[in-house]
């Protein structure tokens, strides 16, 4: 069967349901897909992507509101998809998804904010939503590079810590 196109964000979640189990090419229209979650990339080869750019906590841009937050989550669900390496292996020796279509490494990281134009694979639903299962490396572009090292001979840094686990006054009472 031919590969179907899935443009995010979808207007209704049924659009993804209708394509489940099919080969799809996912894009965000004229915008790139943005890396929003790389927490499980090294462990399971998964990358969270958004069609609406970098994601923020609801209250970072809005006043607290139960109804507003529910609407925000509903819209977010329509714009987010996971890229998966089609493997259930934990801590794989090679992680496919990093910058430039090369495997993940200490020298070739994947940062939130990096982008990709399209992803292609089989669409399925599990765990945290819809996923595109692919066995081909993704070609992420570095759009969120680490800041250059700041060289300032006048800079000073003072660190302080306090161990609250050992905080007692000696009389046996905490």
Model segments located where?
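Extended non-catalytic accessory segments flanking core domains
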Residues: 1-174
